[in-house]
Amino acid sequence: MNTPATIAISIKSICASIYARTAIRHTLDPNRPPMLTQPMQPALEQLICSTFTTLCLETGASPAARDEDILSTTIHLVPQVNTAAIRAAFERIISLRLLAEAYASADRAYSAQMNTFADTSLAAVRSFTTTAAPHPRKTPHIF
């Protein structure tokens, strides 16, 4: 049994999260790459849309057409799952993946850390969906 849920995500909210994360990071270590700022928002919005679509494919969700600032999707969840928590996880995964991509050439360690965090969050989301294909596993065989 699954429960279809519609999740709506604000592009501007994700941009604000990215700006906040880079501001904190820059404050802690100003010698690192510069912060991502408001003039970069059109580029960030494009990346957010493509990352959102990829995330939908990875979780078995069905993305709807973009409506100005809102990205929405329908995802089938196991019963009793809090939709707000899944929405927050989607936003977190998108933010982390964008940070990983943005810092890939400037700070590889930070980029790898963001990818690890995103993968952990994705695994959690996938555990609550009923439409996502199982994560591939290698099974040892002894002959």
Regions found by a protein language model. Name each.
Residues 113-126:
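Short secondary-structure subsegments characteristic of cysteine-rich extracellular domains
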Residues 87-97, 101:
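Elongated alpha-helical scaffolds
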Residues 101, 106-108:
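Mixed-charge, glycine-accented linear interaction segment located at domain edges/termini
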Residues 52-55, 102, 122:
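Hydrophobic residues within well-ordered, non-membrane alpha-helices that form the packing/core
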Residues 40-43, 86, 90:
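Conserved acidic
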Residues 77-89:
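Short, mixed-charge amphipathic alpha-helical segments
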Residues 1-79, 127-143:
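Conserved short "hinge" loops at termini or chain/domain junctions
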